[in-house]
Amino acid sequence: MSLYAPIAAIATAPGRGGIGVVRISGPDLAELAQRLFGRPLTPRHAHYLPFRAADGEVIDEGLAIYFRAPHSYTGEDVLELQGHGGPAVLRRILARCLQAGHDLGLRPAEPGEFTRRAFLNERLDLAQAEAVADLIDASSEAAARGAMTSLSGEFSQRVNDLSDRIIHLRMLVEATLDFPEEEIDFLEKYQARPTLQALTHDLDTLIAQARQGVILREGLHVVLAGKPNVGKSSLLNALAGDDIAIVTPIAGTTRDKVVQEIHIDGVPLHIVDTAGLRDTDDAVESIGIERTWKEIERADLILHLQDVTQPPDHLDAQIVRRLPARTPVLNVFNKVDLLDAAFQGQPDSLAISARGGIGLDALRQRLLQLAGWNPGAESPWLARERHLHALQQAAQHLEIATEHAREDDRVLDLFAEELRLAHEALTGITGKFTSDDLLGEIFSSFCIGK
């Protein structure tokens, strides 16, 4: 598969729509445009033309726009045909393009190949390319704004600034090592240690913001757990604002998980209603309970729901003992509307009524708090787990470098090496030094046509 052969794909989502787009990218597409339309196209102008089959039959009418390299999304020549959004029409237009460009090497594009070419042609860095996919996948306005901030290059600029400062600091270390006869301590002369402290501080700030970006992009896996009939399904419905789960007075109604995505202040939360936890001889219910524990094991946050009208028993104690210690647990006492007196709850617990709506706003805010979301923070860009991991790796190397900076000149070579490793971790975010395997993994997750 040649990276330089022209490629084509339907760029709009599958299904019917008012407009559909066929996108082509590659070298010298002026020749292909001449074959398709029998005339040259003026770059960056919209031409209203018939789209014809090889025998002259009119398939559709629409706009043809030619972008000459390097002034295009991919950095190559790009030809976009905008017609009506019917699947059959778009398939015929694409087939005609592939037929007309067969001897030019035109082939169907692979997922993400247009954006990969934009990256390889330095129209986007890797973090910006990922932001394209995140913008398409954004499930809330906050996530869309964050993706657009990343696409604009703000996150990349912050990373590049840190990288440049690390390079400058490394130059001072190398100069001290390479010119010992000068008897000049470049680290002292150019205040390298305060520079390293400032670098570490700014990197820590960036890590905190990246955590916000990861939460905004990926959300949290929140599991509702507890005995049967404590109101888990009612709480899911209340948070979702819809009747998602079946609610009955019969214990054991929920036998398999029910997942619903909700948004609180733009943050996506994947709420999982599960089978009630109890001892049972019912084979089907037992399978549901086993699945509940699997969901609990992979949860980011557990809401342990309890019925405030019922005293705790041995089963409650068993559940508490089995909950994973590494996962935050919020004890939620439901059905407070059925109490005659005010409820005296435990510290760090919440009292609610899922059906009556009591305490739900407080619960939503507690969920954000436990997620680590800071609503007063600077409007974040979206980040991925790999970005956060790379930033944390860079911070670890700077921490080790700081230790070496406190020693004598005999460890300056180690100081320089830790700075090199920190720089390498950061440049992996923007793709300056990134393996082909990682690139393949990232771009394969894109939709075809993007």
From Swiss-Prot:
Binding site for GTP: 229-234, 248-254, 273-276, 353-355
Binding locations of (6S)-5-formyl-5,6,7,8-tetrahydrofolate: R23, E80, R123, K450
Protein name: tRNA modification GTPase MnmE
Name of the coding gene: mnmE
Cofactor(s) the record lists: K(+)
Cofactor note: Binds 1 potassium ion per subunit.
Annotated TrmE-type G domain residues: 219-372
InterPro entries the record matches: G_TrmE, GTP-bd, GTP-bd_TrmE_N, GTPase_MnmE, MnmE_dom2, MnmE_helical, P-loop_NTPase, Small_GTP-bd
Gene Ontology terms, MF aspect: GTP binding; GTPase activity; metal ion binding
Keyword Hydrolase appears in the UniProt entry: yes
UniProt cross-references to Pfam families, sorted A to Z: MMR_HSR1 (PF01926), MnmE_helical (PF12631), TrmE_N (PF10396)
Location(s), subcellular: Cytoplasm
Domain of life: Bacteria
Residues noted as binding Mg(2+) in the record, renumbered to the chain: S233, T254
Biological process terms in GO annotation: tRNA methylation; tRNA wobble uridine modification
HAMAP family reported for this sequence: GTPase_MnmE
Species of the source: Bordetella bronchiseptica (strain ATCC BAA-588 / NCTC 13252 / RB50) (Alcaligenes bronchisepticus)
EC class (word): hydrolase
Family, as annotated: Belongs to the TRAFAC class TrmE-Era-EngA-EngB-Septin-like GTPase superfamily. TrmE GTPase family.
Keyword line: Cytoplasm, GTP-binding, Hydrolase, Magnesium, Metal-binding, Nucleotide-binding, Potassium, tRNA processing
A GO cellular-component term linked to this record: cytosol
Function of the molecule: Exhibits a very high intrinsic GTPase hydrolysis rate. Involved in the addition of a carboxymethylaminomethyl (cmnm) group at the wobble position (U34) of certain tRNAs, forming tRNA-cmnm(5)s(2)U34.
Subunit structure: Homodimer. Heterotetramer of two MnmE and two MnmG subunits.
UniProt keyword Cell inner membrane present: no
Residues annotated as transmembrane: none
Residues that bind K(+): N229, T248, I250, T253
